[in-house]
Structures are given as C-alpha cells and as structure tokens.
Amino acid sequence: MVRKLATPTILQWPALLGGGKGGRFARTLLVIGIATISTCGITPCLAQGPAATVEVPVIVDSPAITSLRASDPQSPFELARAAQLALDLGRADVAIEFLTKLVADGPEAGALLDAHRRLGTAHFLRFQNNVAIQPVGTEVANRVLEAAANYAADPDRLARLVQQLGDGDSAKRRQASDELMRAGKHAANPLFEVLADPDQEDLHPRARVMLVELGQAIHGPLLAALESDSDTLVASVIQVCGAIRHKAATDLIVGRFGLAPDDSRVAAAAETALIQLAGNAPARHEVELYLRHRAQVYLRPEPMFAPDQQGEVEFWNWEEAQAVETRLPVFDAQVRIADRLLSNLEEISDSPLTPGLANQRLLARLQLAKLDSGLDTPLSEESLQAFAPTSLSDLEQALESALPRRELTPAAIAATEALAAHGDVSLLVTRDKRPSPLAMALESDYHQVRLAAALAILRLDPTRMYAGSSDVLRTLERTATAAGRRIVVIADPHQERATLLAGIVQTVGFEPVVVSGGSALFREAYRTIDVEFLLISENVSGPILTETLQILRKDRRTADLPIGVLADPETLMTREVQTAGDPRTLAMITPQDEEGFVFQAEQLLRSPGRMLVTAEQRLADAELAMTALAKLANQRQRYSFYDLWPLESTLLSRLREGALTEDVAMVLGYLGTPAAQQSLVEVASDTLRPLPQRQACVEAFTHSVESRGLLLTKDQILRQYDRYNGSETLGADTQTVLAQILDALEAPTKGVRFDQPAIAPENRE
C-alpha cells in the first residue's frame, strides 16, 4: 500500500527514510532518484504533468520495532531505554514517540534519578547530541541530568553519608564512600563541617581519608577552607593538602604557618605539609620574605592561572563557614589571593608594611571592595567607612598607581569614591605643576573611571576654577549623549557590500551607521557614547587602516571601543598579525549572514570584558550626568567658572531625540538661551510627544522666562497663539499645555510691543 505525497526536496528525503525493509527500499528509491536527476535534470523527471507527485512507501515496522512497541514502556527508565533501542534500529521517529511520552508524563525526580542510575550519563548525552531527535532529545537529557546533579549536591543527603563513614558496617562505609566520590566537589562542605566540630573528633580520621580520596575534585574548596577561623578544620585541611601534594596551597599554608603559635596543631600540620610540598619548612624570619614576594607576584598583570575561553577561572571563597564556588577573571582571582597573603603579612610582621607593600595592600582592598559592590554600583557607606582611616595621600597614590593598569580599573573607581567621601576640596589643587590624581582620572581611557572621577569632583563641590574643570563638563556631556541605542558604525567604501552588512546588523537588533571612512568615520565614532563597536574595512577610505586605528585608539572616546577589521580571506592572516597587539581589535572576514555576524559581534563585545558598558547602563549614567548638569546650570553664579554654553548643541539634539526629555528640558530651562527656549516650546507643542515630556518642557520654559527673560522672536510668539487658537479639536490636555505656554509668554510681556527683540528681567515693568 502506498500514499501520495507532494514532491519533497532532496534535503527532505532523509527525514522520510526509516529502517527495516521499507527503509532499505526507500534508500534505493533515493539513489535512483538522484541518479535520474543527475542524468535528465530535476524539472522534467520529478514534475511530470500539472500535479507532480511521487509515490513513497509507507514505513513498515520491522518485527523488532513491533516488539518494542508491544512492550509498552511506561517509566522514564523504560522509555529512555526503548528510545535508544529504536535509534539503534534506525527509527528516529519511534524514538521521538517514546521521548515525547516521557516528557508529557512529567515524572518526578526520583523516577528520573532511577533512569540515570541504571542507564548512566552517557546514555542521555547521546540523546543531546543526536540531531535526528531534537528538540525532545535535549529536553529529556536536560531533565534527567539536572535531577542527577541536584541529587549529587543535596547537602542533607551528603551530611548523612558523611556520618555513615563512621558506621560499624564496612559495607555501609564503602557505600557512603562511593556516593561521596560520585558527589565530587559537593562533598567538601559536609566533610569540612565534621572536621570543624571538636565533638566529632572520632570521625575526623575517616573524613580526612575521604578528602584525600576525592583529590583533585576538591582542590578549590581546600584553598577556601584555609581561611576558616576553626584551627581544628585548618589543621586537617593542611594535612590533606600535604597528603595529596596540593602545590597551589603552598602560599596559603605558609601564611597560616606564620600566624600559628609554635606549639599549635596548625603549625605542626603546616610544617609537615610544607616539607611534603616544598622539601622543607621556612624559618620564621623567612615567612615574611616569602609572603612579600608571592603577594607581589600575584599582583603583576601576568596571569598565574590558565583561563577558560571567557578569560575566567574557577575560584572558591570561604563564606559563612562554607566553601563557595564562583568564576572570576584571572587577575581578580590573583588579587584575592594576594590580599590574603598581605593580610597574613600584616598580622605576622612586627613593623608596618613598606610604602610599596602598603600601596599594593590598599590597591587590593580597593579592588575587592569595588568588585563586591559591582562596577556600576557606588561603594556602600560601610565600605567607605573602612577606608576612612586611610590618609588622603595614600588614596591618591593608589589612584595614580591604578590608572595606567586596565586590570585595576575597579580599584581606580573605588579610590575616586573614597576620596570624594573625605570631602576635602584641596584634593583638586595642582602640585608640582601636575594635575591632581582625580583630574588625571578624567583623562582615563575608560568611561567608568572618567564618570566616577567627574562625580567625585562634583561631590567635593569646588566653587572656583581648578585643573580639570573643563574635562568634568566634557565627561558629563559625552555621558549625556546616551539614548539607549546600540549603534554599529560600518566604514566601507564599497557601497553595495556596506549596505548588505548594514541590513544584517539591523536585523539582529543593532542600529547601523554606514560611512566610507575618513572624517565621516571619526565623526560618527565620536558623536555618541551609544556606539557599541566599529566595523572597518581594510580598504577604508581616508587614512590607511593602520593610521585610522591609531587615531581611534589615541582618542579617549574610542580608546577602549571594540573594533572589527573586515578583511578578505586572502589578507585575513596579515590583518590578524597587524591587530595582534590590541585585544579589542579583531580581524575578521566580512559576515555574509546573520549567524556569522552574531558570532563575530559576540567576540567583539566580549573583548572589553567587564569594561563593556551596556545600553541600559549608559542610559542610567546619562541620567546621573543630566542631574549633575542641572545642578550646575541652576546655580550659575556659584558655578560660574563652568562654561555650559558649548553644551547647548548636545542638549538640543537630546531634546529632539526624545530620550531623557524631562532631564534635558530642565537643563535647557536653566541654560536659558534663545535656541533653548524655542526648542522647549516646539517640543511642548508637539502633540505626538508623550504628555509628561510636554509638561516638563512647559515647566522648563516657564522657569527660563522667569530667570532669563523672554528670548523668542515675534514670529515665534505669534505662532504659539495660532497653535492655541487651532486647538479646538484637540484634547483637553493639549489645550492646557498650549495655554500654559501662553501664560509664560504673557507674564513678562504685558504692555510691551511684540516687535521688541527680547525682554530681560531688569527691563520689565
């Protein structure tokens, strides 16, 4: 028996083929079809007559498949096993039936665990990797593997297993040991809990043996546990580190060795472990030298650990008497270890740290404080209080030390906030013909540092000119250009290729701006902080590629901006060599489709690491900048040394764009220029704008007229009367807004002719 199907494409044929006798026949038919196509062409052979069809045999179940169906599998174990058997028989369609039923049944975690225990992880990984049974194959695999992972990490179950290590029945002890081995790193904390409890000392030897058996799986948790306040636990952990030759623990063990009294358990365990790890234990006077040297090594920019593709490493902290796993950039992990070593050194040493070490210690503390709060979140009052005893000169030195090093930007930001908290405006005084460290921070290549420095200076509230005052305004102005857009500037003299790429860029959610190169490229790259990255053709017009890149990198607005150099396949290797020294410039082949562009865009956006500023954060920063500018504009006499007039064009552009309209309107109202008043009136009269924006513009215009006088021309004023008179058919809200504009116009002009160019407050009647 056969049924008629619409003619399939060649790519659809494999999905119609199955196993068994019918499958073999279908495969033969496919071979014949391909041979026919190759000899006579697809149109004459497959499209005969007005309704071309082809006869395809129905897939007939083989005896094995029939038997498999008849077994009627029900449990997750039975269904998963039956699905794999169906795959082995070449029937992906039947496997999908079984797996779909498994998902639809919604089994409990216990049933999924039973399937995992009996079939193993590899069984479900095959489901995940088999393209013929997607997406249900991946869904089943994820559910089963998630249930297994949750079971393995269940702390209550693991705690019971640790207690079972002390059972009198050797079989039960062996079972507990096997289960803990399968739990891997998750077994560490329950074992640590026992080792920290003096009342369970009888179980300590077995717990230590279990840690030794776990070996490399718990290297990270062991390092974290060395921070514990429990000497009982620390002594046991040190013993384990020595037994498994955990060389990465050597530095931390030396620190604990230096802190421990000579006759303590920790000192004895550390001495033995250091002999096992390094061949000998250091003398007491050598401990300080060792810690000083190792801390300096960890604070160097060179990586001490092998990172993953994202530049991160697995790191374990000791928090609330537990080892907690996290992932950190390599340098952040190094800073945390250096901070531990320097902290130990401070406790051990009878004398203060040398100035150089004290500076490094402060840098580490600032870095960690900022990382803990978040790069875009101000330090808490508690954190700032921790730096209150630190002298201003030490904080300034730390800031100056951090500025040239990209990896220390969190420390630089924290230093600016700590300096601002001191509230001493003398921090801005120029010394030895050099600007203050805060003023130097305004010239940083990184937006976060520049903005933090500007906000810190404004918090100090200077009332007279200082070195860097113009840079504060430039920083606020550029920050205020954000509108939450995601702009990609494409520089390519080949118009057709650039247009194609722009279409791809727009499809995936970015806003393309196409230029051929030269001055247009620099203008668009500098225009707004919303530019997320640049795509520059190797054949860019204007300055040659290498000069173009140099110019962009020397300007602080684009110094850290990701740049993709679009190259031909033949020249790609050359461009890779040319850009190898700049980790934020990547050579790439011009993408031809969305998938290729998304892959390359992800690479580019990963290159700045944590210094990448998202569209949401840019918009939040713009609000901060506008608030600061509003304060300066509102108190013009107090802050007369700030020249706000150059900001007018930027603010007018922002008002037209519609982002942060309320904040921009406020600043323009305080600025009180003719162009500002005209723009406020135009936006307030625009019925397509949201009502809150229009009301904000009316309020700002009213304030501007009251403080600066009416600066509109006669024609502009008469236009507002025409608008009001023509608003009979408009809504009540619009009529109210237009009436408020007239109220503001008429307040200072009563009894004055409209042909007067402007009416200043001092000339009013």
Can you describe what each PLM-predicted range is?
Residues 81-88, 97-101, 114-118, 130-132, ...:
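Structural detector for internal amphipathic alpha-helices that build alpha-solenoid repeat scaffolds
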